Amino acid sequence: MNPELIFKLASSLALVSWLGLAVSPYCAPWSPRVRLVAGYVVPLLLAVVYVVLFAANGMAGGGFGSIDAVQRLMAVPGLLTAGWLHYLAFDLFVGAWIAERAGVMGVPHLLLLPLLALTFMFGPAGLLAFYVLGLLWSRRKTQRLQA
């Protein structure tokens, strides 16, 4: 297995999936399928490749007990690629969850697009921004109901 090739293919697949999440509401007949594939099938596929890479490379003299041990893991190209797939899979899954929750909450998709971009680039920051938006959105809805 070539870590560089896996890195490029996985990154491309994740990018296409993020684009799918962004445009899915605008392609109505395909929307549920796009969200299923982009939000669940692709992250699971990335997870499978992650597990295979870890199994193929072992712990390579590293571990998770210290920054030094993690650095030794990341010095191995196959494990660095596995780490990248970890980010891709979880961030994409979180992005799909955000899109799903925002739809349930009635948040307009145009408000969601910057949050998806933020989650794509900076994972936890996008999740945090979504929680802030969710609080503001629910407060706004409550105020409308009381008016």
Question: What are these language model-derived features?
Answer:
Residues 16, 92-99:
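Alpha-helical transmembrane segments of polytopic integral membrane proteins
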